[in-house]
Swiss-Prot record:
Gene label: htpG
Assigned protein family: Belongs to the heat shock protein 90 family.
Record InterPro entries: HATPase_C_sf, Heat_shock_protein_90_CS, HSP90_C, Hsp90_fam, Hsp90_N, Ribosomal_Su5_D2-typ_SF
UniProt subcellular location: Cytoplasm
Positions of region (B): 345-561
Main localization category: cytoplasm
Any one GO CC term of the record: cytoplasm
Residue numbers spanned by region C: 562-634
Disulfide partners: none
Start and end residues of each stretch annotated as A: 1-344
Subunit and interaction comment: Homodimer.
Protein's name according to its UniProt entry: Chaperone protein HtpG
Superkingdom of this protein's organism: Bacteria
Gene Ontology terms for molecular function: ATP binding; ATP hydrolysis activity; ATP-dependent protein folding chaperone; unfolded protein binding
Length: 634
């Protein structure tokens, strides 16, 4: 390093989120402090990738030195560890933007999720990605000297901070391109001022990085004694992991490479490494994380793969190679068929891109299908984290709709649990003889679904019903209309017909009862007028006096509530009021000669049905009043 302090020094305050992150990180990640080295070496590797990419169009950026690498030197007497790279470097504005602020959307949302539980916080912070700030886990002060490739030597920058409220930035002179990070180690960080400790950490975390990582070691004579001289020794293999044969790569290497590309702290759930030659030559390495990113449902969430062309890094977060519902997938794709000067705009409408996207999508679906069949417990872990976004795939990926549908999991009346463990294939296997539809119910919650009066007839006949209570489910069922040749049927729709599961004597008895109750139905319809679409008898209830249902082509209750919650105008849902002629309360209502009291019975039964269906009612005071008036007659 050859730097001299020049001028233009200023002190600036950290963005408030940075201060909070530094505090939390130092206390939550202390037990895993060696990750600071992984993060800083990973950043140095990224800086080299970016220089290679920009030098494609401007070779002068190499400044006569295209041998890229990372070097680590420690000084026990000065208590410092220095990590140096000769990558792209940073300008003054870059330093302020990247080292003084957290340039991520949804940061406030992230911090709102933090608690006082250190293990949970460390997991969240790991998902957020700490990068450069991890230096403060082991250092009580950090100095960064950097010069962006292409800038003059006297336009270099020095950044210094003790990781508290502020930092200083000043212009310096630096002859060499790239970045030097000097860590002034805490007492607890001094273990890293040791050649063998550094060797161990580099081998563990950075073997897969595609550029040399070297440390300054002592020269020894033939007898093994130190001569007092120093030399640089490369520690890692410096071969891009995805270019190696799968048989040569250990599970631990795959796991560490995942942490490098994702900046996640946890091991991935599974991965798929493939090299394809033919119409398109490419290598893909795709990982499924164990935990969902904290901001996965955020509209601005960055997702996508790292893109390499002929082993040259092109861009991060290339979203064009994965459908949106697979935005949790991490990894990379290395293509031989895309141009080196490819841009996001070119990727958008490129046949090669579309072909690679289709291939990567199928790889992930195959991975998940294999997991679902061979490791149910692991797949359930995946579903808990990513089930909501997978449901988007039914609408988004028409080409793979049946495969995506086969991966969905739901609760059902077969399993007395809110856990979503039932696949559609297993439901179809259990269908009753003569059953040709997949029955489902949507509700606000598992409890509401499980206790819905609409289930009474199905339980009595031993017919399984899928229970859906995620907010996305009603929307999902607009697109998921059949599976394995079986149509889906909502059990809250008026067109429901279970007559095939009834014997002739039962049908005849129902017909007689329906005729007897014809006048009661007409009387109820006359009282309610156009408040309901229709009044009719039903025999699908056992312990419930009445329910409301919608026409097959009418908007369902859950969809209406979803749109209302989104602030959209929703047309009034006209319900069909179905009364159970075999229930004691309905018989009591039918026997009532006083029209005023009859009307109160109607109000109470309709109010109950609306409350069970919607969870609320427009005029609860009218409902309560009708109940009170009836109670005074008891």
């Amino acid at each position: 390093m050859s730097e001299t302090v020049s001028h233009n020094k200023e002190t600036r305050g950290f963005q408030s989120e940075v201060k909070q992150l530094l505090h939390l990180m130092i206390h939550s990640l202390y037990s895993n402090k060696e990750i600071f080295l992984r993060e800083l070496i990973s950043n140095a590797s990224d800086a080299s990738d970016k220089l290679r990419f920009q030098a494609l169009s401007n070779p002068d950026l190499y400044e006569g030195n295209a041998d890229l690498g990372v070097k680590l030197a420690f000084d026990e007497s000065a208590n410092t560890l220095t990590i140096s790279d000769n990558g792209i470097g940073m300008s003054r504005d870059d330093v302020i933007e990247h080292l003084g602020t957290i340039a991520k959307s949804g940061t406030a949302e992230f911090f709102s999720k933090l608690s006082d539980d250190q293990s949970k916080d460390s997991q969240l912070i790991g998902q957020f990605g700490v990068g450069f700030y991890s230096a403060f886990i082991v250092a009580d002060a950090v100095t960064v000297c950097t010069r962006a490739a292409g800038l003059a030597a006297d336009e270099a920058v020095q950044w210094q901070s003790a990781g508290e409220g502020d930092y200083t930035v000043e212009t310096i002179t630096k002859d060499s391109r790239g970045t030097d990070i000097v860590l002034h180690m805490r007492e607890e960080g001094k273990e890293f001022l040791n050649e063998w400790r550094l060797r161990d950490v580099i081998s563990k975390y950075s073997d897969h990085i595609g550029i040399p990582v070297s440390i300054q070691t002592s020269v020894r004579d033939d007898e093994g004694k130190e001569t007092g001289e120093k030399k640089w020794e490369q520690i890692n293999k410096a071969q891009a992991l995805w270019t190696r044969n799968k048989s040569e790569i250990s599970e631990e290497e795959y796991q560490e490479f995942y942490k490098h590309v994702s900046h996640d702290f946890a091991d991935p759930l599974t991965w798929s490494h493939n090299r394809v030659e033919g119409k398109n030559d490419y290598t893909s390495l795709l990982y499924i994380p164990a935990k969902a990113p904290w901001d996965m449902m955020n509209r601005d969430h960055k997702s996508g793969l790292k893109l390499y062309v002929q082993r040259v890094f092109i861009m991060d977060d290339a979203e064009q190679f994965m459908p949106s519902y697979m935005r949790f997938v991490r990894g990379l794709i290395d293509s031989n068929d895309l141009p080196l000067n490819v841009s996001r705009e070119i990727l958008q409408d490129n046949k090669v891109t579309q072909s690679l996207r289709n291939a990567c999508t199928k790889r992930v679906l195959t991975m998940l299908d294999r997991m679902a069949k061979n490791d149910t417990e692991k797949y359930q872990s995946f579903w808990k984290e990513f089930g909501l976004v997978m449901k988007e795939g039914v609408a988004e990926d028409m080409a793979n709709k049946e495969k995506v549908a086969g991966l969905l999991r739901f609760a059902s009346t077969e399993v007395d649990s809110a856990e979503q463990t039932v696949g559609l294939a297993s439901y179809v296997e259990r269908m009753k003889e003569g059953q040709d539809k997949i029955y489902f119910l949507t509700a606000d919650s598992y409890a509401a679904a499980k206790n819905s009066p609409h289930l009474e007839q199905f339980r009595a006949k031993g017919i399984e019903v899928i229970l859906m209570f995620d907010r996305i489910d009603e929307w999902l069922m607009n697109y998921l209309t059949e599976f394995d040749g079986k149509q889906f049927q909502s059990i809250t729709k008026a067109g429901l017909d279970l007559s095939k599961f009834e014997d002739e004597a039962e049908k005849e008895k129902q017909k007689e009862t329906e005729e007897e109750f014809k006048s009661v139905v007409e009387r109820t319809q006359s009282y309610l007028g156009d408040r309901v679409k229709e009044v009719r008898t039903t025999f699908k209830l056992a312990t419930t006096p009445a329910v409301v249902v919608t026409d097959d082509f009418e908007m369902g209750t859950q969809m209406a509530k979803l749109l209302e919650a989104a602030g959209q105008a929703v047309p009034e849902v006209k319900y069909i009021f179905e009364i159970n002629p075999e229930h004691a309360l309905v018989k009591r209502m039918a026997d009532e000669a006083d029209e005023e009291v009859f009307g109160r019975w109607v109000e109470v039964l309709l109010g109950q049905a609306m409350l069970a269906e919607r969870g609320s009612m427009e005029d609860p005071s009218q409902f309560v009043g009708a109940i009170n008036k009836l109670l005074t007659k008891v």
